[in-house]
């Protein structure tokens, strides 16, 4: 409509060569980046395309490359986004998925690691979200060995007991109900 140029990033432009518990290394092949080695500092596969999109956006914003390609790639590697598929301790990943797409991406990420790791889910939700649908999606597409439900602070909480009841409808995994979020985290780490 406005005549703005579009710059697509396709998954085929990204060749993943190494995955770890903290990052995904890939080669980017588009624009100024021909076989450029990039590290997306996240466990989630969708962050490869997001990182590539950020680099391509920099090409559009800074076509003279006043910010060097090396600096751009280093900035991607050093990116921190708290609570978004963030590895906070070895084997402990925090994700604040808050909508249907976020849950879908969370599920894909869990599916990519559940063959290698025992999955213990620490879960809470806010009252205005469709948490039953979220729980159903998670339980129908992943295999957690245990679920710890807790409550966030504030007036938007869903009681932990209510969340436990919903989980019990969709999974046979062990369910632990702990309203105190700190105790819930500690409990999840011991399961």
Question: Which positions does each model-derived feature cover?
Answer:
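Extended acidic/charged loop-beta regions that coordinate divalent cations
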Residues: 1-37
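General small-molecule cofactor/ligand-binding pocket signal
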Residues: 4-9, 86, 93, 176-178
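C-terminal helical cap/extension that packs against the catalytic core
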Residues: 92-93, 135-191
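Short, surface-exposed acidic
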Residues: 7-10, 65-72, 174
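A polyampholytic, Gly/Pro-enriched intrinsically disordered region
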Residues: 28-38, 167-176
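Nucleotide phosphate-binding/pyrophosphate-handling subdomain across enzymes
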Residues: 30-146
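Short, acidic/turn-prone active-site loops that include or flank metal/cofactor-
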Residues: 11-14, 124, 151-155
